[in-house]
Amino acid sequence: MLRGYPFRNGRYSMDWHGFSHDDQSIIGQATPTGGFLYPHHPWSLHPTPYTLHRDAVASFTISPRPYRELTRQALRAFYYQRTAMPIIEPYAEGYARPAGHPDTLVLVHASAATAERPENTIISSSGGWYDAGDYNKYIVNSGYTMGVFLMAYEQQRAYYDTLHLNIPESTLPVPDMLAEAMYNIRWMMTMQDTDGGVYHKLTEPDFEGFIHPTECQKPRYVVLKTTPATLDLAATLALAARIYAPYEHVYPGFVAEATEAAKHAYEWAKANPAIYYDQPTMNEQFTPAITTGAYDDYDAQDEFYWAATELYLLTHDPIYRNEALGYCPAQFTPATWGNVAELASLEWMLHPASVEAFAQERQAALLAHLQPYIEEAETNSVHRSPYGNRAEDFFWGCNSEGCCWRGIECLYAYHLTGNERYLINAERCLNHVLGQNATGYCFVTGFGTHSPKQPHHRLSNIYPNGPLPGFLIGGPNRERQDDGIDGVTYPKNVSADESYLDFRPSYATNEVTINWNVTLFALTAGLDAQQ
């Protein structure tokens, strides 16, 4: 059934009427008072293109699976981010390129040197995904991404098992989604030193320009082993060992290898519980100076909580369970790369055996966290959305860490309670990033009639046919950290929800990252699976 929605942008309403492409019959109309477009004969509408007319013309398609292709492309974005292998047809789907950054000759930075691997030791750390708009690879961000990735799979196994991505591994007897994830997991495992610690990132000393990856000439380093990075690897591999267990015939030995590596990492972190990445201080002590993304995090309690949780769910060793419960923070905080506690809490909600009371307390905290946003959506929101109703909603990466993640929280709440109120509000969050916002942009490249054309994304820059499709960009940012840099100039006197530029140098509003894209596909897939 076609639902009625108000055709308005929050400031004024419009007079619309809709036509079917089949026979030009009027299917519905809206008045200039903010009315709803309702079909005259809803039972007769079927999947086909339709057109809305006002001063201009806009076309749309009625589809029984409106989010299917969006989900597919949001997942395929990770394939486009692959390092060390060529992106070739037929998998490239119009965006072929040679391999970039083989990373088989990576140097150990002085900050990461040990007796066994002294400074400038050469190691191989090939594979994985480019992290964002740059050409580097960061463990803390990758770990969070893999957590959301694999937890989404666990929630909708049957759905993902039938989702075809058209990637080189599509012929393997394993879901395409898991095959894509494995490409990054294998790289993450190469970032573990022989003592169990994990390098914080693999990077050039400073950012490359907007050039083709094959043109990059700067040396690449693995940098300082840190507690958060090590625990993120421990959690990721423990989770992966559990998820990939049915596919031992495809990845022989992986489960045992991942389990051992996860335990080794956790023990290293317990022996080194407070080694954090402080880039300015590091650069005072070691050369060359590193000025790429810091992903600095000065509290590892949340990472200990997540790693111990995943190790318990894998091994059922009560030692890990007891340690996990001890690490659980008192305050409920939405998950980001820098605070992964909610990932652990969600796992306990979904696997409550032996900790029923604790799981119920965590679930109550989730629902209490969502309650004011949902009430606002239902009573005091221009777009009837649980996101985007106050200036503080618009920050660096808000489309993901604010909007899409809130939608994912709503999906988990729906799964846990069966209350459709949460499902409705998850969709409202997606509506925001797809265009129901103050800018009018669909914030996903390649989708909609008004989407970003100049993302801060080096890979997209190499294609004359426009940006790579399926990438969520960061979105409006009231802090405008890039204002006045490299030609970035924001209009004066615009509100926080309009502080956005579709301009390549605008890294504060127009960049892409793997951790943002994982929330886009997890949200769209969760909604598509309900169709």
Cite the ranges covered by each PLM segment.
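Surface-exposed intrinsically disordered loops and tails
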Residues: 282, 286-288, 387-388, 488-493
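Short coil/linker segments at helix-helix boundaries
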Residues: 151-183, 215-221, 239-259
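Hydrophobic or amphipathic alpha-helical targeting/insertion segments
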Residues: 45-71
